[in-house]
């Protein structure tokens, strides 16, 4: 019933262990495992529909740990709550925990080993980090104590949000972003149709940066959840750093 824990469960579980995943898990804009999610009945995270599925266990994220989880527990359904991963290390921990919860510790350990091996290949010595701005709808940015912040750091960039004292997430005025003079501006996937919250991403400042190869869209599904797919974001941002350094 949660986008991120659903993906962890699909990674670790046998097919017959899962009876339903959330509709968001089948949304390719947000889910790196949308195709796999379509194999299962979809739910919308409501206690009534979850109860009718008669699950032996529900796994969900901390952001869902509210009235729905309370109701499920009152109905006698065990619920395991996961904290969202705010770092690459936390991804490893959540995979291992999901393996224990679903009785698949060996499979989880294999996934963690593969994760570690790929991460080691992507970590390159960085003599001088370039500076990146993370900028999203409504002028929202993410700091170093977030998964995306850790991804950017691992790929060899310093996050300008740190200079503004942002550790998790906050609004950043466009003027402050411009004055910071980042080497690159990283944004997320755009939704179909026009959203008022995304208007700021069409500002001439960002469009000019894009024309000069200084603004790049990162697939939201790569980093919005703490799964091994986050390493695809590390790889893409690392390649971007190589391109920028090659032009100097």
Q: What do the predicted segments below correspond to?
A:
Residues 22, 28, 147-169, 214-217:
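His/Asp/Glu-enriched short active-site or ligand-binding loop at hydrolase and phosphoryl-transfer sites
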Residues 5-11, 26-31, 140-144, 187, ...:
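Short, solvent-exposed loop/turn elements at domain surfaces
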Residues 47-54, 75, 171-181:
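Short helices/loops that flank or line small-molecule/ion binding pockets
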Residues 1-13, 106-157:
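Basic- and aromatic-lined ligand-binding clefts that recognize polyanionic substrates
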Residues 36-48, 85, 165-174:
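Short helix-initiation/N-cap motifs at beta->coil->alpha
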Residues 90-100, 109, 184, 188-248:
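Structured C-terminal subdomain patch of bacterial secreted/periplasmic proteins
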């Amino acid at each position: 019933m949660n986008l991120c824990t659903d993906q962890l469960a699909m990674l670790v579980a046998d097919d017959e262990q899962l009876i339903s995943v959330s509709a968001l898990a089948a949304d390719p804009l947000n889910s790196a495992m949308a195709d796999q999610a379509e194999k299962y009945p979809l739910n919308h995270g409501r206690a009534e529909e979850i109860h009718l599925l008669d699950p032996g266990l529900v796994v969900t994220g901390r952001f869902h740990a509210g009235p729905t989880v309370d109701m499920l527990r009152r109905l006698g359904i065990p619920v395991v709550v996961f904290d969202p991963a705010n770092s690459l290390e936390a991804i490893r921990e959540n995979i291992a925990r999901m393996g224990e919860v679903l009785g698949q510790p060996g499979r989880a350990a294999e996934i963690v080993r593969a994760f570690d091996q790929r991460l080691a290949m992507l970590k390159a010595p960085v003599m001088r980090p370039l500076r990146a701005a993370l900028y999203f709808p409504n002028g929202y940015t993410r700091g170093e104590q977030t998964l995306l912040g850790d991804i950017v750091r691992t790929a060899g960039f310093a996050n300008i949000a740190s200079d503004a004292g942002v550790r998790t997430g906050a609004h950043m005025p466009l003027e402050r972003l411009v004055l910071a003079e980042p080497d690159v501006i990283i944004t997320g996937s755009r939704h179909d149709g026009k959203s008022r919250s995304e208007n700021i991403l069409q500002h001439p400042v960002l469009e000019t940066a894009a024309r000069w190869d200084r603004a790049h869209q990162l697939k939201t599904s790569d980093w919005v959840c703490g799964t091994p797919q986050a390493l695809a974001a590390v790889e893409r941002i690392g390649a971007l750093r190589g391109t920028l350094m090659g032009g100097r």
